């Protein structure tokens, strides 16, 4: 079993790096404001037709464009879901959503979280899934990538005030990166057996003679961007464990690759744009070390089996509860870590049925800020915050002004870094406390004791860190939970983007200082260890008390 797990992890990472390297070169061209080959003429026509100016923006203008687009998308999606019954492509005549569920869902998809307090096949029409959710899957992913584009430019430009043009970046990211790759993935899914139609639900007779209604719909097109954009919201309630979304072992492997593809490519792009590819490799090493350790822990915990069932004499050599037999325990464990290391949230197994330790690792990966590969764009700019913090700590230890890529890190940057890092832990801990203090919060818990608290902590961690997966033993479709999680998702997304853009605006105006004998190398194993230690230290200090009340207490009981 250990050899199979090692081979699975090694194969996954090897294929991932091979695919991400050329994509990273393409992203580097876009960051450097160089059109991809053959696209310049098309861009000129599009910019002219849409009235888009390619004049560069300062950080406030860039941020305003990103926020404006997302707020407009939020309003449109909210009213679309409220009035779903008036819109076309609704063969099942599904009614509009309640105001609190519509708000929660709109915020969820605009913030790239894709938390779902509903069952897709019984709640949303084809039009809502396509024109509403799928569109936001593209736009939220493009927004995250645009923010990291601006931050990378801030490190590589000198004595400037501009960070690029948000509209140009968004168009290029959507047209030349997300749309083509998503199309290829969708076609592959269709070839493998995923659904893509507009037929009404099909009534069939089972082999037992009972009647069953099979849901239909344009699944593959949404499934592709759901994974590529690290969105995660499933067309069906069972998400990627549903055979209509994820029909074969091969599509499952491609789904995992799609989740990590752009976050990995952005690391390569960062090193290329910075003029030192070792910087990108340093980030990949730090992310990969944490990732491999976490996968190993989850696989080990799930292979050990459920100790409560073993104590009763049950034949439970491995923990297969809540897992698809066609995928097995090792693949399910790998997928769980992939989807929570990135801010995806898609699932092929029920995380609520994992062992105490097996479920704690995905929860902790979210709580440290989704920086182990992370979401498209958001993962890298989240990790860059920890890079700045690690550089600052190293500067304190050696008595030098901290600097990174030749840019001095001053008080303003560190205040903004601390603010951005503290946003999500504050939301998680305060949100979980509020839920446990109120009857409306506690009434949603379907399990008592430490596991019930773990369900609450997981839900708030998932929302605040824009992941979207869940311990499913929580009845979250209530006004209290819909509003609480919507607030966590909104602040967790934009409460980090705003200080990140402010950091970019501050750094882009600085000159790069040449490296000296006292400069801390930020590309070697020493800094990789320092960066990993910083991530682990912040995560441990912040969440160990809360984890001790949930999964740790459950494991020890």
Curated annotation (Swiss-Prot):
The keyword Transmembrane helix applies. It is a multi-pass membrane protein. The chain crosses the membrane at residues 5-25, 63-83, 132-152, 170-190, 253-273, 283-303, 329-349, 356-376, 379-399, 416-436, 484-504, 526-546. GO terms for molecular function: P-type potassium transmembrane transporter activity; potassium ion binding. One of its GO terms (cellular component) is plasma membrane. It comes from the Bacteria. InterPro entries: KdpA. Belongs to the KdpA family. This is Potassium-transporting ATPase potassium-binding subunit. It comes from Escherichia coli O7:K1 (strain IAI39 / ExPEC). The gene is kdpA.
